[in-house]
Swiss-Prot record:
Protein family according to the UniProt entry: Belongs to the CCDC124 family.
Organism the protein comes from: Bos taurus (Bovine)
Function: Ribosome-binding protein involved in ribosome hibernation: associates with translationally inactive ribosomes and stabilizes the nonrotated conformation of the 80S ribosome, thereby promoting ribosome preservation and storage. Also required for proper progression of late cytokinetic stages.
Keyword DNA damage appears in the UniProt entry: no
Protein name from the UniProt record: Coiled-coil domain-containing protein 124
Length: 223
């Protein structure tokens, strides 16, 4: 009886080696695909993060600009009120105090030495320039078609400034919030922003800076 072959079959060994090599190559390829997919996802995540950061910064700058513009408008309005100036109003044509005084002066000169062609007319019969003054107030519009009307408009302007303080509520509250919110944050560091804003609104209701706490002048108040 012949002896069994004790050595390794070279063909079987070669086949196993090829299978192992193919499996290793397949595993390496799969691992590379997984790594590539991971880095692609990571890149997308980084890009989204950067995009959100840029959008947040853009919103912050826009909000800062709006606050600056609101503060500028509020300071401009306060400056006009302190200086006794009439507020700017939309109108198709405006008459300033200087123009009215100039019109009165010319009218006075005209009465003293009238033109021969105008002797038959009094200064009240000579109309002013069309739409000489049209002042659009917050409650409506007031037109000055004569010198007397124009003077009356100027005389009631200062009274009309604060008849409706609620018109300035939004700008005043924004300025109040910018001034007081940092103080509340410092005094209450553990509170959330929503809680701080609730406290701020309560202070605003009692604040003398609140236009609603200032005495409002009725629209038809007699002089």
């Amino acid at each position: 009886m012949p002896k069994k072959f004790q050595g390794e079959n070279t063909k079987s060994a070669a086949a196993r080696a090829r299978r192992a090599e193919a499996k290793a190559a397949a595993d390496a390829k799969k691992q590379k695909e997984l790594e590539d997919a991971y880095w692609r996802d990571e890149d997308k995540h980084v890009m989204r993060k950067e995009q959100r950061k840029e959008e947040k910064e853009k919103r912050r700058l826009e909000q800062l600009e709006r606050k600056k513009e609101t503060q500028r408008l509020l300071e401009e309005e306060d400056s006009k009120l302190k200086g006794g100036k009439a507020p700017r109003v939309a109108a198709s044509s405006k008459v300033t105090r200087a123009q009215i005084e100039e019109t009165l002066r010319r009218d006075h000169q005209h009465k003293e030495s009238p033109d021969p062609a105008e002797k038959a007319k009094s200064h009240l019969e000579v109309p002013l320039e069309e739409n000489v003054n049209r002042r659009v107030l917050e409650e409506g519009s007031v037109e000055a078609r004569t010198i007397e009307d124009a003077i009356a408009v100027l005389s009631v302007t200062e009274e009309a400034v604060d008849r409706h303080p609620e018109r300035r509520m939004r700008a005043a509250y924004t300025a109040f919030e910018e001034a007081q919110l940092p103080r509340l944050k410092q005094e209450n560091p553990n509170m959330r922003l929503s809680q701080l804003k609730q406290m701020l609104k309560k202070e605003w209701l009692r604040s003398p800076d609140n236009p609603m706490n200032q005495r409002a002048v009725p629209f038809n108040t007699p002089k």
